[in-house]
Design a protein with these regions (language model features):
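Amphipathic alpha-helical and helix-coil boundary elements used as assembly
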Residues: 1-376
Length: 376
């Protein structure tokens, strides 16, 4: 175990979290093999009780200077999902839906604490190609195309990756509402939010997509979708995308919907700061105490940065430290009823023709499907 001197936790919807820790130990020769690429848990305490757990895998470990009694260390904790960035591949997934592809991808990397919450039909993709992009980029690209969001749930011994196609029905934080107080920082007897800035931004109002399939060449598979909450902006700002990159009309509407939601992800947002550690991306909360009544509503964090220091426990080595113990957070929120989605990621491009191997059944040279296409 280490003594935590400083920490910074960055977490967001649809992103791997990063927990940077500055540590101290009375041991000056820790074996790196016992730490690097090993699981670890950070516990944030409040009023003598654990307020948050953050479990992850150590990605970076540094030994720093040694003082009179203690040696300083630095450590980076990330989820197992971040390890997918270390691998890339060239392959084709056939006749699998995106939830099935993601599940197979995570199983391949032994990400076993994984929970899918699927409420809508996701059609299988005839061909889905990974063209040299990293496994993590493929995971995010497919998830964002399909309108899936993910976040992490923690306990003392594990972190669970939760993936869903509906955000509105996800968790709410425990322990009652989050309080707002305009009093100066440090003057409140309980955790509060002490600043709240609400913004609205003009964004794309409509999304139109079209694509064709040789199976029905005269059908344009066109889909239109208008955004929500357009009362305060013009409704004529339209984005037209072609090709829509779907071969079935049943997939066209959710593709159009997820892209529009990604373009409008910050149309209504709030930036807050405070010291209530219960704020977690994806987990909704009720706000109370704001002087403007309509801000006292349900909100959902999409990004949170927690920072804390604990110099007092370093005894004589903390003599020149600027602070004793401190904690604060900054967060970005959206209204709870907003089906927030990340911006879509571009597909990788292949540079010119590729050499492929023609395959076929045993005893035959090639395999043709019902339209005469040769399988490679």
């Amino acid at each position: 175990a280490f003594d935590v001197v400083e920490f910074e936790l960055e977490e967001a919807l649809c992103e791997p979290f990063r927990l940077n820790l500055k540590l101290a130990s009375d041991k000056n020769a820790i074996d790196f093999r016992q730490v690097l690429d090993q699981p670890g848990t950070f516990t944030l305490w409040q009023d003598g009780r654990p307020a948050r757990y953050v479990h992850g895998i150590v990605s970076h470990f540094t030994q720093g200077s040694s003082g009179f009694r203690r040696t300083r260390y630095e450590l980076l904790l990330e989820p197992q999902l971040a390890r997918l960035e270390l691998c890339c591949n060239w392959r084709i997934f056939q006749e699998k839906s995106v939830p099935e592809i993601l599940q197979a991808l995570l199983k391949e990397h032994r990400v076993l604490d994984y929970e899918q919450r699927i409420y809508h039909e996701h059609l299988p993709r005839e061909y889905c190609v990974q063209a040299g992009d990293s496994d993590h980029y493929l995971h995010d690209r497919l998830a964002f195309e399909e309108g899936l969001v993910y976040y992490f749930r923690f306990d003392e011994h594990r972190h669970t990756l939760v993936c869903s196609d509906r955000l509105y029905v996800q968790e709410r934080i425990a322990g009652g509402p989050v309080l707002f107080s305009a009093q100066p920082e440090g003057d409140n007897p309980q955790p509060v939010l002490h600043s709240f800035r609400y913004s609205e931004n003009v964004r794309t109002a409509r999304q139109t997509q079209r694509d064709y399939s040789f199976k029905r060449p005269t059908y344009d598979q066109e889909h239109h979708l208008a955004g929500e909450a357009l009362e305060h902006q013009g409704s004529s700002y339209e984005r037209y995308d072609y090709p829509g990159r779907y071969k079935r009309s049943g997939a066209g509407r959710p593709f159009t919907e997820s892209r529009l939601r990604g373009h409008r992800r910050d149309a209504r947002e709030a930036s807050v700061s405070g010291d209530d550690p219960r704020l977690i991306p994806g987990h909704a909360f009720a706000l109370e105490g704001h002087p403007r009544a309509d801000f006292n509503a349900w909100w959902r964090p999409v990004r949170v940065v927690h920072r804390g220091t604990q110099y007092a426990g370093q005894e004589e080595e903390s003599a020149d430290a600027p602070l004793g113990v401190s904690y604060d957070l900054r967060a970005e929120l959206v209204p709870e009823d907003v089906e927030w989605r990340p911006a879509p990621l571009p597909r990788p491009r292949i540079d010119g023709p590729q050499i492929a191997t023609v395959v076929g059944p045993a005893g035959e040279e090639i395999h043709c499907d019902e339209w005469g296409r040769v399988k490679v």
